[in-house]
UniProtKB/Swiss-Prot annotation:
It comes from Legionella pneumophila subsp. pneumophila (strain Philadelphia 1 / ATCC 33152 / DSM 7513). Pfam families: Gly_transf_sug (PF04488). Multidomain protein with an N-terminal glucosyltransferase domain and a C-terminal phosphatidylinositol 3-phosphate-binding domain, which guides the Legionella effector to the surface of the Legionella-containing vacuole. Both domains are essential for the cellular effects on the eukaryotic host. Induction: Is induced in the post-exponential phase of growth. It is an enzyme of class 2 (transferase). This is Subversion of eukaryotic traffic protein A. Disruption phenotype: Cells lacking this gene grow similarly to wild-type L.pneumophila in both murine bone marrow-derived macrophages and the soil amoeba Dictyostelium discoideum, indicating that SetA is not required for efficient intracellular replication of L.pneumophila in host cells under laboratory growth conditions. Keywords: Glycosyltransferase, Secreted, Transferase, Ubl conjugation, Virulence. It is found in: Secreted. It comes from the Bacteria. The gene is setA.
């Protein structure tokens, strides 16, 4: 049996037999919930919440905060101010709504507040019932004195112009509602499994871009999660993929009215543009006042949670969060008043044709100018080639920071040409000197716990990729880890010695013959790689205009035509340009393209994104599946009947 219900301006085809309160209408508790964890709520959001409280005196208006990390003095003043406006402030830690997964994310050095809010709203509603609202939704009219919802649970549609999913910016439910409780349990598991949605360990230390953070949040805890979890629970009609959900928006306005007639109540988002303000990439408050030892202990607890709950060991990520900023550098329009000793300060010119000035900051915080050539026509920062890390490495290798040699200046100048930062990223952070030492201390602390040491062995993907770094840092592996590898390496070396002693002159002749054949085949292999690159780029061009949720970037073709392609495809196109300009070999370009495709495929594989632009998903899968050596060898075999 199916029923169509109209509410919040949308209609949803629901399987009533799978609903816990089938055939019932439940009254929504008279509470309006807002969430603001981290820093103190900005004034513009306070005004919005205050208006809700003023226009709905019959409802209890609540703002949920995190007293563990909010600035204490500012929070006390905030609580008093809200009390004067008739608004209650509650602490998530005291009310039993802050699960371990939520605390884990909040304790990160740069928490994803969007994910935290997604998880909190479900737990709060499960515990107290009522209405959850994002703090940027304006109130144009009061709520009705009584609101009854079919089965005690309602969601709003996606508010950014999409037409195929739900949203979680407005949620209504009755206290103890079983649907919301199941969603609260499921969202925690989705968060714990979030690393399957992230990039691989190889990229754990790279700065997460805004687009990546948006995608991960939407898919792991946001609207994408809601839609697919409700389908999984059997609440949404599964006769078709997306056709089960329909709604009608009135000029992007939310309808809070149970009737089918013209809406009486409209609630309009304060900002109807997707500016990602709900996923800020900022340090949590108070982190600057914590001692290094306190931050280290916090990191140990976070790593333990990851190992026990997610089965992943992200040592590199936490080491970089704790990195010591020595021999660091920053970019500024003018001299910073807070200079750090033993660092570099790069002053950008006020106009595009001006000269970049590099200073070395000594122990006394004195600026020592480092002469540099005039830098013009700087290339846009490439996230793949990572010139920031290259530039930092060059700086750390300068023999005399105050008086670098002419050769060192030339190298730094070349690195600067690749270093044109984005206008909103003057302060760029990478692997600072000291991360290796921190990684070593973290490793020793974690592996000193026998239980964690045993669990680390089960973190196959992360642990395997960590082994080379462990050897490089001279760290002690967990007991028994790597023994088989070392034994295998010893056996291989013995076999090599025996082979070298028995080859003789015939072996030498054969070696020369193979070498000649290899040289003759080199050009053919390069041609095969070139053809493969051309094929990939033709597929990229076909993606013109096929943009997904995160938008795209424009690129100019050789014929002058400008195409607008998805972000991952744009990065692949950038590698193609570098290959054409001789900056990358064919094999290096292909390796980078495949790597980008694998990362993009991980983001795009979620059904929520893949259904928006299936051509993009198919392209990423195709490139990601390429086995470079096998493909080139197979092509050469087909053409020449030879095995390379």
């Amino acid at each position: 049996m199916y029923k169509i219900y109209s509410y919040l301006g949308w209609r949803i085809d629901m399987k009533t037999e799978n609903l816990p309160q089938a055939g019932q209408e439940a009254q929504i508790d008279k509470k309006i919930h807002f969430i603001w964890v981290g820093h103190i709520m900005p004034q513009k959001n306070i005004q919005v919440v205050s208006e809700w409280a003023e226009k709905n005196p019959g409802y209890e208006t609540i703002i949920w905060v995190d007293k563990k990390i909010a600035p204490a003095k500012e929070l006390d003043l905030f609580i008093l101010d809200m009390k004067s406006k008739g608004i209650t402030v509650k602490d998530i830690n005291e009310e039993g709504v802050c699960r371990d997964s939520i605390r884990h994310e909040l304790d990160q050095e740069s928490p994803n507040y969007g994910m935290v809010s997604d998880m909190l709203r479900l737990n709060i509603l499960a515990a107290e019932g009522g209405i959850y609202l994002d703090s940027d939704i304006l109130c144009s009219a009061p709520f009705p004195d009584e609101i009854y919802a079919p089965f005690g649970f309602l969601l709003s549609p996606w508010s950014q112009g999409a037409n195929n999913t739900l949203c979680n910016d407005i949620i209504l439910c009755s206290k103890g509602n079983q649907i919301i409780q199941q969603l609260a349990d499921a969202i925690e598991q989705s968060y714990i499994a979030r690393d399957s949605f992230e990039f691989t360990h190889e990229y754990a230390s790279m700065k997460e871009t805004k687009g990546e953070r948006i995608a991960k949040t939407l898919g792991v805890t946001g609207p994408g999660f809601l839609f697919h979890q409700l389908k999984k629970m059997g609440i949404l009609n599964d006769k078709s993929e997306m056709e089960a959900i329909h709604w009608e928006l009135q000029d992007q306005r939310y309808l809070i009215d149970g009737s089918v007639k013209e809406p009486d109540y409209f609630y309009v988002p304060q900002n109807n543009t997707n500016d990602a303000s709900w996923v800020p990439s900022i340090k949590r408050p108070g982190i600057e006042n914590m001692s290094f030892q306190e931050r280290l202990e916090n990191a140990v607890q976070l790593i333990a949670f990851d190992i026990q709950k997610t089965g992943l060991f992200n040592l590199d990520h936490y080491a970089n969060e704790l990195k010591v900023k020595q021999n660091s550098w920053c970019i500024a329009a003018e001299t910073s008043p807070e200079l750090k000793p033993d660092s570099y300060l790069l002053i950008r010119p006020r106009d595009k044709t001006g000269e970049w000035t590099l200073y070395y900051v000594d122990e006394d915080k004195k600026l020592n100018p480092v002469t540099l050539p005039v830098i013009k026509g700087a290339i846009k920062l490439s996230e793949v080639s990572d010139p920031l890390r290259k530039f930092h490495t060059l700086l750390s290798q300068v023999s005399d920071p105050v008086n670098p040699t002419a050769h060192e200046l030339k190298q730094i100048g070349r690195a600067l040409i690749e270093l044109k930062p984005r206008q909103d990223e003057w302060h760029c952070k990478n692997k600072w000197s000291g991360a290796e030492e921190i990684a070593q201390e973290l490793w020793q602390r974690i592996t000193s716990n026998e239980t964690l040491r045993a669990q680390i062995k089960q973190c196959f993907t992360q642990f395997e990729s960590l082994k080379p770094r462990v050897a490089e840092l001279g760290l002690t592996r967990a007991s028994g880890a790597g023994t088989e590898v070392e034994a295998h390496e010893s056996t291989v070396k013995e076999q090599e010695i025996i082979s070298q002693n028995t080859v003789g002159e015939e072996g030498t002749k054969e070696k020369n013959s193979v070498q000649l054949a290899s040289e003759n085949s080199s050009d053919e292999k390069i041609k095969t790689a070139h053809d493969l690159i051309d094929e990939i780029i033709q597929d990229v061009i076909q993606l013109d205009g096929k943009l997904g949720l995160l938008g795209g970037n424009t690129r100019q073709l050789e014929d002058g035509r400008v195409i607008n392609i998805p972000n991952g495809a744009a990065m692949i196109f950038d590698d193609y340009k570098k290959y054409k300009q001789g900056e990358l070999t064919a094999e290096s370009a292909l390796e980078s393209m495949i790597k980008i495709a694998k990362l993009s495929n991980q983001l795009n594989r979620h059904t929520f994104f893949n259904q928006r632009q299936p051509e993009t998903g198919q392209f990423y899968k195709k490139v990601a599946a390429i086995d470079l050596q096998t493909t080139i060898a197979a092509e050469y075999d087909n053409n020449h009947g030879l095995r390379i």
